């Protein structure tokens, strides 16, 4: 008798994706982040669902409903902090996942990579709208500043902003629609993640060497399921430690003050995971230029496959490219730091130099270095 998991219409999809999937025998722990992102998404959807049961998307009661969740709901504080810090863990896994893709040349799978870039944009949009919901000072002013950037678009900019706000400022209608979008987007993310996996399984996984692994495959289960479970345990350990010992470490104290349109906070800044893009935005004195640079800082990832000039896929055997990759990582950390600093000397010039270096590395320096490495190896 044939095994049910191989014949049943639903079970055979799961079987071919997670059980009998042929996987390269040499993939390292850097390949764990896909499953960790799936776990993060499940945590966010579940905690978000329970929060939505008690939250009210009204400017008069939003802030007090979050207070009510933390004080009066059974384990409400735990659910709220799991959701807030779960977003941080989501972005840590996301950045490491993208970094691994850049380092090992996974971007050569064009469809998978482009869906991934689309996923990154969607997750960023979801996180931004979620940050507005508690209706604290930073929620209100962050929403005002970021949505107002759309007014830089020629001709339709100001109309577009008023259309998004549903009025002349961020108000009740804006909060209600942000809550609606924040609720629906994670399910769209889940669907996109399914498409992401579909395209990945068309080609099979990449591996650290960047060479074809068709001659040496092993079963996904039990080898990589066990490996993924270890990663999940470490993720949950880190998340629970953060939630139980230092839940406000990554938050902003200003968000514990009720939103007040008449009182601007001294330093308006987004959550830590947007600071690198925020620093690039602030580095350009022109509004439209800043907005374009902000969008391009993420959209540049879609160009990476076309800038690949090396004859090797992975950076594993390319020491010069490796050095440049780690310079890029350091540059992004510098931008993250700058994004959280006030707009004054010397932070302005450091931010501008780091922004220039970011675009130069990806668009010019790394492709030229790859060509030089080809010549050094006489290819």
From Swiss-Prot:
<keyword id="KW-0408">Iron</keyword>
<dbReference type="InterPro" id="IPR048259">
    <property type="entry name" value="Cytochrome_b_N_euk/bac"/>
</dbReference>
<keyword id="KW-0999">Mitochondrion inner membrane</keyword>
<keyword id="KW-0249">Electron transport</keyword>
<dbReference type="GO" id="GO:0005743">
    <property type="term" value="C:mitochondrial inner membrane"/>
</dbReference>
<keyword id="KW-0349">Heme</keyword>
<feature type="transmembrane region" description="Helical">
    <location>
        <begin position="178"/>
        <end position="198"/>
    </location>
</feature>
<feature type="binding site" description="axial binding residue">
    <location>
        <position position="196"/>
    </location>
    <ligand>
        <name>heme b b566</name>
    </ligand>
</feature>
<comment type="function">
    <text>Component of the ubiquinol-cytochrome c reductase complex (complex III or cytochrome b-c1 complex) that is part of the mitochondrial respiratory chain. The b-c1 complex mediates electron transfer from ubiquinol to cytochrome c. Contributes to the generation of a proton gradient across the mitochondrial membrane that is then used for ATP synthesis.</text>
</comment>
<dbReference type="InterPro" id="IPR030689">
    <property type="entry name" value="Cytochrome_b"/>
</dbReference>
<feature type="transmembrane region" description="Helical">
    <location>
        <begin position="288"/>
        <end position="308"/>
    </location>
</feature>
<dbReference type="InterPro" id="IPR005797">
    <property type="entry name" value="Cyt_b/b6_N"/>
</dbReference>
<dbReference type="Pfam" id="PF00032">
    <property type="entry name" value="Cytochrom_B_C"/>
</dbReference>
<feature type="transmembrane region" description="Helical">
    <location>
        <begin position="347"/>
        <end position="367"/>
    </location>
</feature>
<feature type="binding site" description="axial binding residue">
    <location>
        <position position="97"/>
    </location>
    <ligand>
        <name>heme b b566</name>
    </ligand>
</feature>
<comment type="subunit">
    <text>The cytochrome bc1 complex contains 11 subunits: 3 respiratory subunits (MT-CYB, CYC1 and UQCRFS1), 2 core proteins (UQCRC1 and UQCRC2) and 6 low-molecular weight proteins (UQCRH/QCR6, UQCRB/QCR7, UQCRQ/QCR8, UQCR10/QCR9, UQCR11/QCR10 and a cleavage product of UQCRFS1). This cytochrome bc1 complex then forms a dimer.</text>
</comment>
<dbReference type="InterPro" id="IPR048260">
    <property type="entry name" value="Cytochrome_b_C_euk/bac"/>
</dbReference>
<keyword id="KW-0830">Ubiquinone</keyword>
<keyword id="KW-0813">Transport</keyword>
<dbReference type="InterPro" id="IPR005798">
    <property type="entry name" value="Cyt_b/b6_C"/>
</dbReference>
<comment type="similarity">
    <text>Belongs to the cytochrome b family.</text>
</comment>
<feature type="binding site" description="axial binding residue">
    <location>
        <position position="182"/>
    </location>
    <ligand>
        <name>heme b b562</name>
    </ligand>
</feature>
<feature type="transmembrane region" description="Helical">
    <location>
        <begin position="226"/>
        <end position="246"/>
    </location>
</feature>
<dbReference type="GO" id="GO:0006122">
    <property type="term" value="P:mitochondrial electron transport, ubiquinol to cytochrome c"/>
</dbReference>
<keyword id="KW-0479">Metal-binding</keyword>
<feature type="transmembrane region" description="Helical">
    <location>
        <begin position="77"/>
        <end position="98"/>
    </location>
</feature>
<feature type="transmembrane region" description="Helical">
    <location>
        <begin position="320"/>
        <end position="340"/>
    </location>
</feature>
<feature type="transmembrane region" description="Helical">
    <location>
        <begin position="33"/>
        <end position="53"/>
    </location>
</feature>
<feature type="binding site" description="axial binding residue">
    <location>
        <position position="83"/>
    </location>
    <ligand>
        <name>heme b b562</name>
    </ligand>
</feature>
<dbReference type="GO" id="GO:0008121">
    <property type="term" value="F:ubiquinol-cytochrome-c reductase activity"/>
</dbReference>
<dbReference type="InterPro" id="IPR016174">
    <property type="entry name" value="Di-haem_cyt_TM"/>
</dbReference>
<protein>
    <recommendedName>
        <fullName>Cytochrome b</fullName>
    </recommendedName>
</protein>
<dbReference type="GO" id="GO:0045275">
    <property type="term" value="C:respiratory chain complex III"/>
</dbReference>
<keyword id="KW-1133">Transmembrane helix</keyword>
<feature type="binding site">
    <location>
        <position position="201"/>
    </location>
    <ligand>
        <name>a ubiquinone</name>
    </ligand>
</feature>
<dbReference type="InterPro" id="IPR036150">
    <property type="entry name" value="Cyt_b/b6_C_sf"/>
</dbReference>
<dbReference type="InterPro" id="IPR027387">
    <property type="entry name" value="Cytb/b6-like_sf"/>
</dbReference>
<keyword id="KW-0472">Membrane</keyword>
<keyword id="KW-0812">Transmembrane</keyword>
<feature type="transmembrane region" description="Helical">
    <location>
        <begin position="113"/>
        <end position="133"/>
    </location>
</feature>
<dbReference type="Pfam" id="PF00033">
    <property type="entry name" value="Cytochrome_B"/>
</dbReference>
<keyword id="KW-0496">Mitochondrion</keyword>
């Amino acid at each position: 008798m044939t095994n049910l998991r191989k014949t049943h219409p639903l079970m055979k999809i799961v079987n071919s994706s997670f059980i009998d999937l042929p996987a390269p025998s040499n993939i390292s722990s850097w390949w764990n982040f896909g499953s960790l992102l799936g776990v993060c998404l499940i945590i966010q959807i579940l905690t978000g669902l329970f929060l939505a049961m008690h939250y009210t998307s009204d400017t008069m009661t939003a802030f007090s409903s979050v207070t009510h969740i933390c004080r009066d709901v059974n384990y409400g504080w735990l659910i709220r902090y799991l959701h807030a810090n779960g977003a941080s863990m989501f972005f840590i896994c996301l950045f490491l996942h993208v970094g691994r893709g850049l380092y090992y040349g996974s971007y050569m799978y064009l469809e998978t990579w482009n869906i991934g870039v689309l996923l990154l944009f969607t997750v960023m949009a979801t996180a931004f709208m979620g940050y507005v919901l508690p209706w604290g000072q930073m929620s209100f002013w962050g929403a005002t500043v970021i949505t107002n950037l759309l007014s830089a678009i020629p001709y339709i900019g100001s109309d577009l902003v008023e259309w998004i706000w549903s009025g002349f400022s961020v108000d009740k209608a804006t909060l209600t629609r942000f809550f609606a979008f924040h609720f629906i987007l994670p399910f769209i993310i889940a669907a996109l993640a399914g498409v992401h996996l579909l395209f990945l399984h068309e080609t099979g996984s990449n591996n650290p060497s960047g060479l074809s692994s068709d001659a040496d495959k092993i079963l996904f289960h039990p080898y990589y399921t066990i490996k993924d479970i270890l990663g999940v345990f470490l993720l949950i350990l880190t998340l629970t430690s953060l939630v139980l010992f230092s839940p406000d470490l990554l938050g902003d104290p200003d968000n514990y003050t009720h939103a007040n349109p008449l009182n601007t906070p001294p330093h308006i800044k987004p959550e830590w995971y947007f600071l690198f893009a925020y620093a690039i935005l602030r580095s350009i004195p022109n509004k439209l230029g800043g907005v374009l640079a902000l969008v391009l800082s993420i959209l540049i990832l879609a160009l990476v496959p076309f800038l690949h000039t090396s004859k090797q896929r992975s950076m594993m055997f390319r020491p010069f490219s490796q050095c440049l990759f780690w310079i890029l990582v350091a540059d992004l950390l510098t931008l993250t730091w700058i994004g959280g600093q006030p707009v004054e000397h010397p932070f302005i010039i450091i931010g501008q130099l780091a922004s220039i270096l970011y675009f130069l590395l990806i668009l010019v320096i790394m492709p030229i270095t790859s060509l030089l490495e080809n010549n050094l190896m006489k290819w």
